[in-house]
Amino acid sequence: MSNPITTAEVGRNFANPCSRWHEKGALPYQTDGKLAFQRLRQPLFTPAIRPGFRLRREDKLFAIGSCFARGIEWALIEQKMDVLSKTTKFDSFPAINDEARLGFTNKYNTFSIYNELCWALDPAAKFPRKSLVDIGDGLFYDPHTNPALQLASLEETIHRHQIIESVTRRIAQCRVVIITLGLAEVWRDKVANIFLNHAPIRDAVRSHPDRYEFHITNFAQNLSNLERIHTLLSQFGHADVQIVVTVSPVPLRATFSGEDVVLANTYSKSLLRTVAQEWAAAHKNVHYFPSYEIVQNSDRLVTWEEDLRHVTGKVTEHIMKLFLRHYLAGSPDTPYKLSASPNPVPAGVGRGKTTISWSSDGDAAAVVYVSKDGAEPAFFASGSHGSEEAGWIEAGATYEFSLNGGPNLNTPLARVSVTRLKH
């Protein structure tokens, strides 16, 4: 449960121009409109995003989770970021289809993400070799990797997972960890007493029909897994590890629940979305990024490939541009500006005046706050850009103006201090 919010914070939150869905008399097709019913008419939805930390160019990053994590990974690589989850070590892994090489590390549920991190980071944890399945003809199946990986001998199967563990171990060097949550439907191996990364392949079920059972996991189970992941990264990871959690917008390929796949997918994504929110609320170094909402609230014709499962490159590019704009300090995609003119304010009779100008590159949720001599910040203005006069500048006082991506005051996008000359 999140902490109570003070009335002062509520006032700042309500000043957020993106806090309202509709207002009487507002024009629905106003392209720079801040109301939800205006922004939702754009082909690509742009939500108000409040970054909880700043990503630095020299930071190392690691992406783990569902296949959507791979799209995020490549976008960061194109920005010349140091993404340690990228590797050439998987180039020798043979696939049975056109699965991307990095796809061999896809982790589709919170159980498999935790398992892989535990085996890689905790010296006391050992990979359960008894979960490897003898399919026959000298071939073995590893249910903790991607099912697109071709079967191999026991020795080769173990060797492959050792490579995956060695790559996953790099996460300990990374200040920024991006975790993408994918599925709530999970399979369990009763013999090895462990949850799997994906549904067991047909040959495994055919050879061992009573070995596996299907689970529709709940909120408590998934939150518990994320808490255990947080403990692992806190104990074995970077001293200032920052975790960005997202929910993959890619829907279920199929459901084993007996429900309509659309209903099953809605349950899965809703559960993971609320789990992510609860996890982020519990830890200052866990931050939710709304890639799921961006996709779901964009134009369907722009968003999806023909299968209505995979997101188009255009949307992934939009998502990553928003991520970099808000999180990456010094990014060319973050042209936030805040200025005061004149500054310092000339001496004179009465209170002085200065004009505060700001620009947030189209961020409709941008808010300018002002604090006098370190007092509680107060709302000054809002909007993606603009100019407002501050006509109450006193000599001997310092006014700190800050441009924020919404009511969050912890990570201002730009600052300017204003003073007035004395006689």
Language-model features: locations:
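Extended, solvent-exposed regions of the mature portions of secreted/cell-surface glycoproteins
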Residues: 334-423
